[in-house]
């Protein structure tokens, strides 16, 4: 009887033990479906076609609803005991909890009404819509047109929110808005065929579409540009000139806005995934800046210059470091990238299948944006990753920065990490939606250092370029916290960047504008890179001759983008496993 009772206990205990795991996986499925529903254009790029004719809802009511729904997910998540989950699901739970908590917290700040920065905005994101969608069938083109035709409603919503933001004191500083107007006016195309929105209709006709229907689709697209999109962008331009720009903020700091200090503290936590304070980060930046300055001094003297400053003057002004056409800059960039491609197997055991391409940054945004950026592709939609290069102001785009820049943006940096994440056997929300700046950008900055192993920094100028990029990210820690927590002005920030990096004036201006208009984001780079370098040093010391750099890199990338404490735990577990091999 006792044995039978024990057997009954075991039989009934199994479902009870499984219940929390089942509840958790059900929550994961519902949460992922929610993410797709709230991100209809991204869902299309992932191959989910349920929302093909929809665009995102930017409204504050939608923000409030999403915050409530995130809070409901969070309550359900907290009711599931962590101890009942597998080690893998405990990591999923921790990452999901952080993401949901940040969604709820972000919605409490008035800064949610600030819908654009000097780097991006709803109007710029929509102008790049075609870059992220498949165009293989007639249905693809029809759904794209349906989305274009909804832009005036999105634009009106965004302008209403921005008008409220102006009334309540959430406005970008005057000092950063010099190039913002062009990001609006540059999208307006008098000839619809030359519009960015029309570009998909210049491609070969889809196989399932006859000539007459294709001609009709092209006519509909021209109509959309002329009668739908151009008027919406013109309305935005008029609003910007008459209702936004005259009310731009005099202070460069987000702390001057209502609730700004609390908002900045949130942004620091969010972007670094740490509990570091602005003051602690500022001090780290000063130490790193001093260390890198000393290295730059050594390189300058070895190159025959009397000082670091003398070498930097030469790097900024010597014509031999610059090209005169966009095509030449893209060619030099492509040469570096193909060289790196051939060296990747020596540093990584697993490489992504998705390729990447190189394109110039669109003209309407190039003059006011950064040197380069990466846009992920989509294996499901047959879209390669894209490394965008700034080909404006060519006298400010030196060749010596191309190796470090390319390592960061393409491979082994962003493309390698993100395209690999898209292939990993992770919970779908982590595979497709999770990106922590401290990891993603920390990895990109760490990837620049791998140019040493690859032999790319083979001249003093290229080595100085790498060190300047290191100094640039160290300076971000000083400048971002200086502006938003310590009362610095833009002029102080620009001077610190000039004194501590070899960046050209155009780059410095664009970068400082970015830090001012996007508080905290720039902190993740150096904080993340320092953690990855520290973990590599820990592994090298612990494993000695057993340390395998390829296996270390594969381990760092094996879980996709994660908070830094999760990364540390996974590397420590790998070190223990390697010791036992």
What do these predicted ranges mean?
Residues 18-581:
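N-terminal maturation segment of proteins
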């Amino acid at each position: 009887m006792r044995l039978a009772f024990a057997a009954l206990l075991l039989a009934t205990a199994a479902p009870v033990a499984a219940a929390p795991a089942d509840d958790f996986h059900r929550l994961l499925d519902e949460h992922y479906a929610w993410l797709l529903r709230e991100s209809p254009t991204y869902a299309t790029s992932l191959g989910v076609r349920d929302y093909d004719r929809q665009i995102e809802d930017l409204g504050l009511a939608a923000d409030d609803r999403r915050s409530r729904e995130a809070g409901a997910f969070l309550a359900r998540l907290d009711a599931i005991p962590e101890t009942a989950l597998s080690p893998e699901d405990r990591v999923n739970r921790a990452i999901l909890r952080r993401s949901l908590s940040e969604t709820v917290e972000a919605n409490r700040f008035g800064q949610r009404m600030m819908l654009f920065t000097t780097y991006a905005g709803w109007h710029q994101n929509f102008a790049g819509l075609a870059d992220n969608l498949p165009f293989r069938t007639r249905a693809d083109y029809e759904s794209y047109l349906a989305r274009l035709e909804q832009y005036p409603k999105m634009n009106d919503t965004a302008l209403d929110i921005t008008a409220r933001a102006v009334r309540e004191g959430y406005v970008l500083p005057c000092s950063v808005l010099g190039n913002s107007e062009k990001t609006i006016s540059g999208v307006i195309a008098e000839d619809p065929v030359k519009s960015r929105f029309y570009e998909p209709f210049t491609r070969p006709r889809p196989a399932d579409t006859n000539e007459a229907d294709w001609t009709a689709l092209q006519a509909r697209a021209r109509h959309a540009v002329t009668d739908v999109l151009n008027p919406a962008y013109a309305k935005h331009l008029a609003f910007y000139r008459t209702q936004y720009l005259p009310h731009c903020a005099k202070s460069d700091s987000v702390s001057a806005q209502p609730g700004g200090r609390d908002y900045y503290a949130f942004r620091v936590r969010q972007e670094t995934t740490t509990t570091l304070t602005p003051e602690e980060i500022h001090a780290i930046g000063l130490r790193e800046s001093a260390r890198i300055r000393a290295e730059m001094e050594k390189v300058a003297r070895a190159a025959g210059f009397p000082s670091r400053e003398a070498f930097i003057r030469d790097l900024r002004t010597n014509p031999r470091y610059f090209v005169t056409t966009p095509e030449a800059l893209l060619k030099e960039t492509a040469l570096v990238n193909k060289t790196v491609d051939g060296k990747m197997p020596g540093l990584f055991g697993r490489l992504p299948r998705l390729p990447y391409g190189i394109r110039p940054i669109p003209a309407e945004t190039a003059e006011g944006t950064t040197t380069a950026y990466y846009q992920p592709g989509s294996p499901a939609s047959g879209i390669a990753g894209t490394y965008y290069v700034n080909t404006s102001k060519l006298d400010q785009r030196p060749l010596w920065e191309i190796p470090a820049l390319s390592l960061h943006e393409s491979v082994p940096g962003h493309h390698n990490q993100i395209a690999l994440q898209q292939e990993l056997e992770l919970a779908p929300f982590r595979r497709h939606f999770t990106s922590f700046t401290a990891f993603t950008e920390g990895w990109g900055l760490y990837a620049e250092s791998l140019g040493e192993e690859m032999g790319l920094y083979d001249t003093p100028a290229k080595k100085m370029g790498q060190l300047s990029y290191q100094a640039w990210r160290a300076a971000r820690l000083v400048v971002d916290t200086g502006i938003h927590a310590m009362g610095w002005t833009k002029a102080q920030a620009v001077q610190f960047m000039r004194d501590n990096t070899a960046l050209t004036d155009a780059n410095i201006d664009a970068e400082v504008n970015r830090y001012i208009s996007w508080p905290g984001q720039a902190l993740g780079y150096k904080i993340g890179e320092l953690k990855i370098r520290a973990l590599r040093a820990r592994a090298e010391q612990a494993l000695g001759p057993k340390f395998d750099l390829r296996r270390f890199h594969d381990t760092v990338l094996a879980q996709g983008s994660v908070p830094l404490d999760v990364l540390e735990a996974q590397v420590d577990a790998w070190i223990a496993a390697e010791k036992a091999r």
